[in-house]
Amino acid sequence: MERVRDLASEKAAVIFTKSSCCMCHSIKTLFYELGASPAIHELDKDPQGPDMERALFRVFGSNPAVPAVFVGGRYVGSAKDVISFHVDGSLKQMLKASNAIWL
């Protein structure tokens, strides 16, 4: 979990994904459309990916474990959570507050 914590804090917005995950692609696209440039960690392309995926599942309980979204170093949630935050307008506010976007 330490590696996940370190990576989750490296930028204002961080998304743990898998390259074959359609919801991961959707969340990445949403962030790009909002003007954010998140750090993307493809767990299926990282040698430590399986360990990080297990840690994400164990700590946050999301199944599947990806996408796992962090804003300002804080776990925001999975795709369902992020979409809910986007719909109610709070995702953009989180991104602004963490300096992931400026407008």
Swiss-Prot record:
Signal peptide (UniProt feature, chain positions): none
Gene Ontology, cellular component aspect: cytoplasm
Main localisation: cytoplasm
The keyword Hydrolase belongs to this UniProt entry's keyword annotation: no
Start and end residues of each Glutaredoxin domain: 1-102
Similarity remark: Belongs to the glutaredoxin family. CC-type subfamily.
Main function: Has a glutathione-disulfide oxidoreductase activity in the presence of NADPH and glutathione reductase. Reduces low molecular weight disulfides and proteins.
Protein name: Putative glutaredoxin-C12
